[in-house]
Amino acid sequence: MPGKLLVVATPIGNLDDLSPRGRAALAGADLVACEDTRHTGRMLARLGIDKPLLSLHEHNERQRLPRLLADLEAGRVVALVSDAGTPLLSDPGFLLVREAAGRGVPVEAVPGPSAVLTALVVSALPPYPFTFAGFPPPKAGRRRSFFRRFASLDHTLVFFESPHRLAASLDDAVAELGDRPAALARELTKLHEEILRGTLEELRAAVAERGALKGEVVLVVAPAPPAG
C-alpha cells in the first residue's frame, strides 16, 4: 500500500505562522524532503522535531525522484517543504508531485504561509485576477523580454526578486511595463517587515536612493491600464 506525500507550507519569517496541522504533519512524517537540510533542520529543532532530512533542490530533483518514489511506494510518509512558504511556487517539488500522483500515491496539501498571497493582500492593488510569474531572468536581455510578455495583461502581476538584482529589474520593469502603481514587500512577517507603495518609477528611485535592500523581496505591479 502506498504511503503519502504531504506538501507542507512553512513560515516565511515568523515561526508562529506554522499551523498546528503543519506541525503535526512534520512530526508524523517518516522523511522530510527539503531545499536546504541545514535551514530545515534548524526550524525542526526549534519545534522539537527530529526527522531524517533529504535535500531536494533545483539541481538534484530528478536524481532524487527514484529514492523518494520508492519510499512512497513502500508505504512511507514524505513531507515536502521549501525553505519558506508554500512549496512548488518558484521552488522545487513539481516533478515529485507529478510523478507521485501519476503512480497513485496520495498527495495532500497542508496549506499555510505564502509570500505571494501575503504580498498581494497588503499591496493595496487589485487582488484578482493576478498572475504570479516567479523570478525574472538574471540576464538583462532575457529580463526585458520577460517583462514585455506581461505589458498588456490586465492582471495584477506578482514577481519574486533577489535584493542584489532588484534595481536592475525595476529599471527593466519601468521600461517594459510603464510607470504604473506597484508595491515592494520585503522581510514579510519578520521584525523589519516593510511595504513600499507608489509607482514603479517611484519605487525605482527609492531603491536607488537607499541602495540594496536586505531580505527577500516581492514586487507587485498593477494591471495594464485600459487601451485607449
Model-identified regions with their sequence ranges:
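Glycine-rich, flexible N-terminal cofactor/catalytic loop recognition
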Residues: M1-H59
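A contiguous loop/helix-start segment that scaffolds small-molecule binding in enzyme catalytic cores
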Residues: P2, R76-V77, T156, F160-G228
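Short active-site oxyanion
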Residues: L26-V32, G104-E108, T156-L157
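Alpha-helix capping/helix-boundary segments
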Residues: R38-T40, G85-T86, A115, R165, ...
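Conserved helicase motor
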Residues: S55-R62, P136-A140
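Glycine/small-residue-rich loop that forms an oxyanion/phosphate-binding "nest" at active or ligand-binding sites
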Residues: H57, L65-S114
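Short acidic active-site motifs
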Residues: Q63-L68, R142-F146
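Class I SAM-dependent methyltransferase SAM-binding "motif I" and its flanking Rossmann-like core
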Residues: L95-L153
